[in-house]
């Protein structure tokens, strides 16, 4: 049987969208409950949001034949962000302006700019992955272990953190945008 074009495929799409939206909504509700001093209720919303995320993952994997490799996921993510900034938000802003919703049009335009940055970031990370420069740079940089905070100076991130024994995957180039 072919899933593509079937009623079941449409149902999976609706189920995925519904679960993904519920997850996001429940995280907003959790934040509000926490701000209002209801930590137990916030925890219930967070737990349910995590359940909804897992439900969405089931439907996503069925729709996409699993979850692809990181390079494929980066390409897919970049394509989605490209659509959002070149088409979706551009047209949404235009329509909002035509209808007199200038503030909403402005927000669509500004979010579109952010989506463009997202696309560029995904493409740059993909380029780094393809060039083998995720954990190796041309010049010396500071590498930061995200687990214990160890700082290593060099062209290559350590294979294993000398402090906490976590693997190289925990290292990122240290950002110093706070100075």
Regions found by a protein language model. Give the residues of each.
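Non-heme di-metal
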Residues: 1-179
């Amino acid at each position: 049987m072919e899933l593509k074009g079937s009623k079941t495929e449409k149902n999976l799409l609706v189920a995925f969208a519904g679960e993904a939206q519920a997850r996001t909504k429940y995280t907003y509700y959790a934040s509000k409950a926490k701000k209002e001093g209801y930590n137990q209720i916030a925890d219930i919303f967070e737990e349910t949001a995590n359940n909804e995320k897992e439900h969405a993952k089931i439907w996503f994997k069925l729709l996409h034949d699993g979850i692809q490799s990181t390079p494929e996921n980066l390409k897919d993510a970049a394509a989605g962000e490209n659509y959002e900034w070149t088409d979706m938000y551009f047209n949404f802003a235009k329509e909002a302006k035509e209808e007199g919703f200038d503030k909403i049009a402005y927000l669509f335009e500004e979010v579109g700019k952010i989506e463009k940055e997202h696309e560029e970031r995904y493409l740059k990370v993909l380029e780094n992955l393809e060039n083998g420069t995720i954990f190796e740079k041309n010049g010396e940089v500071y590498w930061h272990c995200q687990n214990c905070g160890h700082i290593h100076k060099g062209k290559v991130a350590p294979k294993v953190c000398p402090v906490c024994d976590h693997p190289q995957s925990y290292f990122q180039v240290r950002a110093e945008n706070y100075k």
